[in-house]
Amino acid sequence: RQMKKALIAYVATLLAFLLLDGLWLGVLMAPTYRELLGSLMLEKPLLLPAAVFYCLYVFGCVVFVVLPAATWQWAAKRGALVGLVAYGTYDLTNWATLRGWSVQVTLMDWAWGTFATAVACSVGFLLARRLGKV
């Protein structure tokens, strides 16, 4: 029963995060990122490291946020905190070390990661509770 809940939480959180990030990176903000990052961006992202990132990041979200949560509000708040830390370390490191990585990109991506992680963790929690009968 716990394994079923964990699997549902993982799949639900992963699908939510992929949908959100796909819309953000692929549809809504693709031209903005291209304009702001220019030559730093590949024409097509490398699928293997992207897949490993999503699987690993969502695993952390499920272990540290979704499964320990008692309410969706707690999952949202703790998810936002995880997103704030994870995306903050990524964006601040890039700003500190890469030519062409601006404060604008840092703040935009950091805010997005915080929001997307909060939403994905909330969705993962709600679906795990509903479908996992917990």
Task: State what each model feature region is.
Residues 3-134:
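Juxtamembrane/disordered regions of integral membrane proteins
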